[in-house]
Amino acid sequence: MLQLKNITKDYKIGNEKVHALRGVSIDFRESEFVSVLGQSGCGKTTLLNIIGGLDRYTDGDLIIGGKSTKEFKSADWDTYRNHSIGFVFQSYNLIPHQTVLSNVELALTLSGVSKSERRQRAKEALVKVGLGDQLKKKPNQMSGGQMQRVAIARALVNDPDILLADEPTGALDSETSVQIMELLKEISKDKLIIMVTHNPELAEKYSNRIIRLLDGKVVDDTNPYDRNIVEPIENKKGKEKKAKKPSMSYLTALSLSLNNLMTKKGRTFMTSFAGSIGIIGIALILSISSGAQLYIKSVEEETLASYPISISRNSMDMTSMMTSMMK
C-alpha cells in the first residue's frame, strides 16, 4: 500500500546542506498502528510531511498503491491528500465560530460532495468518535479531549486510507490521552495510522509497531512488514475511489464568509466604520483640492480682467539712420 524507498530529504541553509532524512526505507501494511519515536530534530515530522504529501523528498521514491510519485504534479499531490490522507495535529485547528458539525463538514467541501451527504457523513464521523450528542456546540464550549476528537472526526470524514497524527496527545492530560489512544487503536483495525510521538509509554501500549529514528535514519523497527507474506485484503475490496479535482463552490465560499462576518458583528462594524472614515476623508481631501484649484483659477481670471495686458508694435527707420551716419 505505502512504501518508502531510500527516501532522502535535504534542506539548504545558506551554503550549508542539512540532512533531515538519510536513506529511509519502510513498508507499511494496509491497516496497522505505527508509532514513530525519536529525539527532537531526528526527522519524525519531516517523515510524516513527506508521507502526507506536504513536503517533497530530495531523493528516493514514495510508492502509493504500487505507483511511484516521482512524476507527480501538484494536482496529483492535491488529489492524494484530499482522498487518501487524514491529518490530526497537536493543535486542533478548529474554526471557533463554526459548530462542531460544520467543522467536520468543512473537510468535505473540497471533495465535490453534496450538502446532504456532507451532513450525513459528518454526523456518522462524530458518532464514531463518541460526539454524536455534541453536534451543535462550538469549539470553545468543549474540553481539549473533545476538540481532539472533533479533529479526528474531521480527518476520518473523507474515509482516507491513511491517518497521520503528529503529537495528537501532546496538549492533553494523561487521562484524556489514554482516551484518544484507545480511539486511534480502534480506528487502526481498518486503516493505516502513523503517529509521531515523544511518549514511549503510550506508543508501546497501543501501537503494534514502533519505528525509532536517530539523525534521520531508521535505527529500529519492532514489526517490519515482509512483503512476501500475503495478508487478507477482503475488507479493502470495493473501496476504489474516484479521484475528483478538489474545488469549493462560490456559494459555499460566500456562505462561509458571511457566516464569519455575522459571528463577529462588533469587529465587522468597527472595520466598516474605520474604512468609511478613510473613504470619506479621501473624498473630502479631493473635494477641497478641486475647490482650491477652481478658486485660484477664478482669482487669476478676475485679476487679468482688471489689469489688461496691452501689446504695442514699434518700428525703426533704418534708412534714415544710415543716411545720417554717412554724412
Question: What is the meaning of each model-derived region?
Answer:
Residues 157-161, 190:
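A short, proline-enriched helix->beta-strand linker immediately N-terminal to the Walker B motif
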Residues 163-166:
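Catalytic Walker B motif of ABC-type/P-loop ATPase nucleotide-binding domains
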Residues 267, 280-310, 314-318:
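Alpha-helical transmembrane segments
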